[in-house]
């Protein structure tokens, strides 16, 4: 079974639902659906959730004799959904026929194979009457059986009781995606639920930010639409012992009429609300007084800032702003003025490639203080190999590229803390430096580029031919047009579109160029090039020729690893203008096409294109290069003027 690192994403979307105890089934059916589910699991051992790229979801039991064809057939009968010319994917894996690799409670994605697809297919109502096609699950089902989800299980019971009593969830009006407060029978918020198909630019986004199918680049090109949910869960699972205080989080299949389902053709909201099932992140609601953007940072505990920063570095958080750091006042004797910090919203962590992270705490005075002995011990106890094994076990849909970023960042954190760097210094080494009109790789990325070059130069002496399949191009060909693969440079905040520092939606990027070229041309000549010219443009971090694209270009992995003939340009050229369509697919008023909203950003380092032996060599060389990089950073820090607030006492 072939692995496809760039195959469509493994998250779930809005779903047409079959009869359940809450959809009008008889009381007897409601009492027996759990028994039916138990008997089915005894015979098959596996329950999976199959969804289409536009949001329709169906839970089904797998028998030993089932294969990809039978799964597609069930989906076609149950949802009246066409399955011809489609692929069934499981994370990075494209399933051809055998389903033995699919684990219990796993989400699968059914995706059409057309090169140019619209996201206009509506979520159709089910028509199948056969018991085998019915989704007889309860209103909330947890995907996974980790002991870490025990708190979530109790929350689910409270919410289900409230749902049966008629307590309605409350939509969250802030943010760019769909989110809902689910309450207990007393009307108190218990959990915040974020359906994966209501993310920004996903098909059923309730706030007008539509235009993408599941698996296409989202707010960040390195985080695909529909995949933020399992990242939220990953952050919780990696926060061992609640070290950073991440609230309990799980991935669930949840059924309710409050969820949004857009008209698939025009993106309009239907007038009539119907019960739909969705895959969503399910996080414990934490009562708080305000968030970090509304409060001065001087009262924040050093330990809390350090612990949250350690987590952010491990998971390469690209969106740690003040709005997703909740602040809760601590009451009690001797607790005057003390607060507790709760980190939330980790959907943009663990990207598939390195890009520019955002750490709100990087200039806080607490971040400039040394780590405590306890914090250093915790960092040194981290084992990225065990972390990856755990995530593969609990979140089988997670991509290997995300796990490689986790390994890279954990090694970087361990080595940096052992060298004596503080949190602020580590964060600065991971953050890119912006100058007017250009963007340069971070110090971490520079080390990765050099390590990758070393591996490539070693491979030159033992060249080998690689068989390139169409699967390597799946992710790129899934995009409606070339514009879709440009990286976004958006911070996930409500006021982004009014306060974006690059107000024209575009920034000139530092660019990887060919080191051997016939002549150097100036920027104006580059802009005036004719259509016959073959410009080299940055797509993710690979060189990609537009002409080669039409000729079925060679492997992206080969091109991106061949860095021996490349160098970081001394001059920065303007980004090529993205291709535009004549008309957006979502033309209804109030809806914003994803292609119209995403500005361009660069990705200098891609880790997914290395084979296993190359990855091992890369990590060895990476660790060798860290010492000189840390020494350079220390020298630069000492030569700088003392940071404002460093002398504050806590």
From Swiss-Prot:
Enzyme's top EC category: transferase
Sequence positions bearing Phosphoserine: 593
Keywords on record: ATP-binding, Kinase, Nucleotide-binding, Phosphoprotein, Transferase
GO molecular function: 1-phosphatidylinositol 4-kinase activity; ATP binding
Region named Catalytic loop: 316-324
Superkingdom of source: Eukaryota
One Pfam family it belongs to: PI3_PI4_kinase
Every PI3K/PI4K catalytic domain range: 166-463
Binding site for ATP: 173-179, 194, 283-286, 345
Protein name (Swiss-Prot/TrEMBL): Phosphatidylinositol 4-kinase gamma 7
Species: Arabidopsis thaliana (Mouse-ear cress)
